[in-house]
Amino acid sequence: MKKIIFYFIIASLVFGETKKWDAHSAYLLPQKRWEMGLFQPFRYGYSESIEYSVHPLWFFVMPNFSLKKSQSDIAGFTSASQYKIVYPTPFLNMIAKKGTMGIIAPEFRMPPMLGLSASWLMSKNMAGVNLTLNGGLDLGFAFGDLDTRSTIDLPLVYHRLGVYYNKWGIHTGLDVQKYISEKIGVLVDLDLRLLPGLKGNYSLEHKLLISWHKSENFRIMTGYKFVMGEYPYGSDMRLLPYIPMAEAWVPIIELQWGKSRK
């Protein structure tokens, strides 16, 4: 049951992506357009050069905010910088308990923590294929004693929260997107996360998503994420989403909405 609860969060990470629906790329939403999904953050095109996003479902237990800003083109690539901030402490302390909702042992009290991330994104259309390169730096600040035994050793989760134990990390990746028809698109990506010096210092992540666009205001997505990496207990790999009780992988359906304000 503990893993089921936390894999609901992982679903947000699995689908966690002037081009609409391109959260993963250097393209910004058009001004006054918003988009959101069951697991995706709410995104809003504030201006022609600035887009912001928040995860509304998690905001009150894990305050978060992201800002994407367009930059000058480089070698024909559309470029943008992205900055993220997250305060995970309230949620982590919520799950530091015994029983069904407990994932972290109750003897651990998580101190105030702040996560910062800065990324550089470059996108370009090549022969009908949208290519995006990204890379950046992650910083984790713990304002108090953070016990190293309190790590959550689960795929996707460990290497994202590990930055608070390691103080810093690096991420880089490649995204390839192609529309195979007017309404159907395919997204394939490969991402690497590094936590130099930490036990369990890397995670290699691959994702495949297929989307059906009913209109510019609604789409349905399904797919999987494959994770391979090092953890405190050794090497591991997993196909996600994963249902622990059934000991099986199942595809997950994501619904997304969008609208342009006049």
Short names for language-model regions:
Residues 176:
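Cysteine-nucleophile amide-bond enzymes
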Residues 20, 62-169, 173, 226-229, ...:
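Outer-membrane pore/translocation modules
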Residues 47-49, 72-74, 127-129, 179-183, ...:
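Outer-membrane beta-barrel channels and translocator barrels
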Residues 27-42, 46-59, 65-67, 79-87, ...:
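Transmembrane beta-strand segments that form the barrel wall of outer-membrane beta-barrel proteins
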Residues 22-25:
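Blade/loop signatures of beta-propeller domains
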